[in-house]
Amino acid sequence: MRDLTTNKTAQNSTPSAHRGRGEADAEAAKIQQALIPRLENKALHYLGRYPSSAANLRQVLRRFVNRKVMRSHKFADYKAKQNDSAGWEELVGTAIDTLIGRYSELGYVNDEDYAKNRIRLLRGRGASGRHITAYLLSKGVSLPLIKQALASSNAEFSAHIVADDGENHENVTELAAARRYAARRRLGCYATATGRRKPDWERRHLASMLRAGFGYAVAKEALAKKPDSDSEG
């Protein structure tokens, strides 16, 4: 008798449970529809000002949701009604992933192009390979892609510097970057007369190069003497 009663109760509660789930799904869809335009406005505004990897854009949009979107009672109240935050986080994650997927298809977000452009810019400023790698990793670019982009950039750059195909492309590019860094910071052979009068200036300049990510041999060579005229193109 107890089994029959239990089954009857379960059968009677099923339509109500379905209605509850249906209403919850409808509300979630409505909230997501309201959220996506706000995410899209933020994403397009950001991409219009800065290049970005997919992972970095995802972080930007997550921060935007936490800092700005949640000020709206509509979204704050919906999150508060959830038994836990997992449902809300899943809704936000789905909306962001949908947006980034669309932008990737349109070419607005491309990790390979982003890595190449960042490497070109940072090398021009005298950044070491280690510094560039750490920077791109912090932006969510995968290590294999970073290595591939660096190798391509090194080969392209060194082709304009040396004619010997046996020359190590990475060493050539790293030395050129180290010299740029030293020149910008007035280190080593680029130091001013005032800078050379400071105590222990040579050791301090070398330490600065090492902290910037350059290897010892490259740093010593970059600090020792300026390149011959026009040797770097």
Locations of regions flagged by a protein language model:
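An alpha-helical, amphipathic repeat domain used for nucleic-acid recognition
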Residues: 1-233
